[in-house]
Amino acid sequence: MKNLFLISAIILLSVCKVSAQKIIPAKDAAKHIGEKVTICDKVCSQSNKAFMVTLFLGGDRPNQLLRVAIRFSDRAKTKGYFDTSFEGKDICVTGVVLNGRDGPYIRVNNPEQIKPLLLDSPVKQIQTLN
């Protein structure tokens, strides 16, 4: 019985650890290459091309702190969600931080990875304190 409790506790802690997300500002993205994180910041500019939508967080291109890349093949499955302009809006994006030639980026495959950052959000309050 004791072993069953111990095994259950270990499994529960493992699941909690896996589901926990780190929330970081765009300026720290380069420190988290290869990690799945949630990054919250302002979209300073947006590039809409036929094959890709790119959001630039933390600064205008080429001085952005993070790029968010949405390929056309993924954009087509989202029924117009990525046709919206995100420029000037505060968002949170969740995904694995990758290292690209222009710095860190996150590839977005579905709209669930991008959420608006609400003004009364605890994350927004933390960012404004820093």
Residue ranges, per PLM feature:
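Sec/Tat signal peptide C-region and signal peptidase I cleavage site
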Residues: 16-20
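Sec-dependent N-terminal signal peptides
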Residues: 4-14
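OB-fold single-stranded nucleic acid-binding module
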Residues: 21-130
